[in-house]
Amino acid sequence: MAQVLETVEINAPPDEVWAVAGDPGRIGDWVPALADSTMENGYRSCTMQDGAEIVERIVERSDEQRYYVYEITSSPLPLRSYSSRLAVHGHGDHSHVTWAAQFEAESADLEPDLVGAFERIYREGLITLRDHVEFAAAA
């Protein structure tokens, strides 16, 4: 089982970070790899910049604990059993955001490329989230 974990520290209170990150349908606002994202009936549709469609089901979500878990239900990617968790942890006026996933590649030789792609997408998304929230907090 492949695993991915990316984290970022954000100089803003966790409730401010969660106000942006906690809405699964708005993930396209802060993940550069996505051209668009929408939510309907617990399912999120993500359109990648190259036009590929990924459909995800939100499995669990808690505003109180500031996290959600989702799984891919439809994707052109060569993987299965994909599950991911996005969480915002508070540290006073600062936040620690984690984005983790695990999945099985359709073949072992594809795993390194898939892990690398998700690491890049998660890292770029978290950096964009940080910049967006910190800019809004400073305004």
Regions picked out by a protein language model, each given a short descriptive name:
Residues 78-85:
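Amphipathic hydrophobic-ligand
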Residues 9-13, 49, 73, 89, ...:
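Solvent-exposed residues in well-ordered beta-strands and their adjoining turns
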Residues 4-6, 56, 68, 84, ...:
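Hydrophobic residues positioned within well-ordered beta-strands of beta-sheet architectures
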